[in-house]
Amino acid sequence: MTAPRSSTPRHVPVMLAEVLAALAPKAGAIYVDATFGGGGYATALLEAAPRTAVFGIDRDPEALVAAAPLARRFAGRLTLVAGRFGDMVGLLVGAGVRGVDGIAFDLGVSSMHLDDPERGFSFRADGPLDMRMDATDSTQARAADAVNRLPEAELARVIRRFGEEKLAARIARAIVAARARAPLKRTGELAEIVRRVVPRARDGIDPATRTFQALRIYVNDELGEIERGLAAAEILLKAGGRLAVVSFHSLEDRVVKTFLAERSGRSPLPSRHRPIPQAPARTPTFRLIAGIRRPSEAEIATNPRARPGRLRAAERTDAPPWSDAERRAA
């Protein structure tokens, strides 16, 4: 999630200083901004050291079109790549790159998407019930398809699983009752349905928040994409290369935490209460660095959306990637 646009042209992503410190950019190195968005990480990496090269990946064509001036400014050093970061290995190998020195991920939905009602991500402004990261992909289901077509039990499962919503069954029941009268097409319609059946929390969080999060994650397969992206990073990073991942809610962070715990050899040990199937020991492919970091109070004051951000970082060892072995064995 990137910071909202301001009156200045510079696009500043969440925890920029901390991400740069984790990646430790060096002259002549190759980096990947895996969630390019407004290009904040990419720009900072290009400015941080001479002769750095950055590949900016984004599945949203609109983001890459908007980045044309930045690409001209850093001609020969910034390469824009259209696609999903879960496909990073193929995308970069296709561009002639087989190893990189650092990869940054800024997970979740970008402020550019949230602030545009026509993209259908926000419950604060009415718009089409879309939520696709790539609005040009006609093969991908929209949020409207999910709320109008999923059986009630499956819809409740999605809202509970991806929104961590305790009242998922009640919400699904209300949605099914509403769609029986007329198909749901607008974010405003859905938000009002949820608000009618979910009490407002004491902390002031909108009752529709968790349902919208759940549908967005479901529509874009965000958790699966994160798993694929981290596995791709393991394959692409050179020994000593750095990985920096900023997540914004517990589901994202759990995927990142689990991956790094496994790959660094810090997974929970088996016990008689929680046995873990025996498997051949593997050499750790990452070394954790810096511990978990959170935004400073100063950053939160200027950008409240940064508050839930969590940064996890790791350094690649010289061990063969587990992901590559798994892919060959499949």
Describe each model-derived feature in a short phrase:
Residues M1-A330:
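S-adenosyl-L-methionine-dependent methyltransferase catalytic core, i.e., the SAM/SAH-binding region
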